[in-house]
Regions:
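A compositional/biophysical signature of low hydrophobicity enriched in polar/charged and small residues
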Residues: 1-336
Length: 336
């Protein structure tokens, strides 16, 4: 199974560039010069192309992607059931929290779905209860990750297929090492999570803000990646602008004794970008969640049906996003 990109004016170099920088953006003094050497073009050509791709909206931002849990944050998926005439109001209020990264309206009784991350000293239930007190909220369900089977997919802009992503530089597992965050670490994280400027020496800006050299900045970033605190430093693409316009969350009701088997099988499908086990409630029976991105609703439905037949689970629903209220990286260690 595969799904392809919409017709796009991008040339082959643009597509190859997007393929590379969404997973292996170089941590070097002049990163665009280093990229240019791989393609036999000038540094200014790469800067121009990446600037153009950002302007077009294909690249959302370029920054460090951190592991929420390694930073001491608690995160969860949350489903709100909201009166239809209050959806916009509630969604806008939810968006004000810096720990809300993704927020969508979906076609279901639970019509607002968002991810929430709270800091080490914050209580998620207090934050959620405050949100749930908003006018129009009927009820909500907290759906934290009980087990992770897959996270992340690299969109193949050349061939139109999703592929399994690789860590920066080479395949490796994070080194097992305890990480106790310091105030200085927080300073680094605040800088590394910012969108990188598209200029010849972009890393000079965060380095100067931290009062250090770029070499020291790179050493710290690579150390974070080595121990798994930073997943990667990369360009983040917008799925819709890249041609994957159908955002479908497939939820499955899987027998408890086979959930690990099914979760691991789901993780092998290239169309599945994320796969998690989550809790169930009396009014929510689905315990396995998977995300797919396709070029149309019909294509997504066909993908789901084919996966269903292969894994032998027919009790599932696809919750399509009808509106995107917010999609951005969590702003770590920023005050509400």
């Amino acid at each position: 199974m595969s799904f392809s990109l919409q017709t796009s004016p991008l040339d082959l170099l643009d597509k190859r560039l997007l393929n590379d920088i969404q997973w292996t953006f170089p941590l070097f003094e002049r990163p665009f010069l280093k990229i240019s050497l791989s393609y036999g073009v000038s540094e200014s050509e790469i800067i121009h192309r990446i600037s153009k791709l950002k302007t077009k909206g294909l690249i959302r931002q370029i920054n460090a992607i951190f592991d929420t849990r390694k930073l001491g944050y608690k995160s969860a998926l949350v489903a709100f059931s909201v009166k239809p005439d209050k959806v916009d109001f509630v969604a806008n209020e939810i968006n004000k929290h810096p720990g809300v990264s993704h927020n969508y309206e979906r076609s279901h009784e639970f019509n607002i779905w968002f991810t929430l991350a709270v800091g080490p000293n914050d209580d998620m239930k207090i934050v959620l209860n405050n949100m749930a007190s908003l006018d129009g909220v009927i009820k909500y369900r907290l759906l934290p990750t009980l087990k992770l089977y897959k996270i992340g997919v690299k969109l193949d802009m050349v061939n139109g297929d999703p592929t399994v992503p690789l860590p920066s530089d080479k395949v490796r597992e994070p080194v097992a090492k305890s990480f106790e965050i310091t105030e200085r670490d927080k300073d680094f994280i605040r800088e590394l999570q910012k969108d990188l400027k598209i200029v010849p020496e972009p890393f000079r800006i965060p380095a100067e803000n931290l009062g250090i050299t770029t070499t020291e900045l790179f050493d710290r970033a690579r150390d974070y990646e080595k121990i798994g605190v930073m997943r990667r430093f990369a360009a983040i693409l917008r799925h819709r602008e890249a041609g994957f316009i159908a955002n479908g969350m497939i939820v499955w009701n899987v027998p408890t004794d086979s959930i690990d088997e099914i979760g691991n099988r789901l993780a092998t499908f290239p169309e599945v970008s994320h796969c998690y086990r989550r809790p169930v409630y009396k009014d929510w029976r689905f315990n396995l969640f998977s995300m797919i991105h396709a070029r149309s609703l019909e294509s997504a439905k066909k993908i789901a049906l084919e996966i269903s037949k292969i894994i032998g689970i027919d009790d599932y629903q696809i919750l399509f996003s009808t509106r995107e209220f917010k999609k951005e990286r969590v702003k770590y260690f920023e005050k509400v």
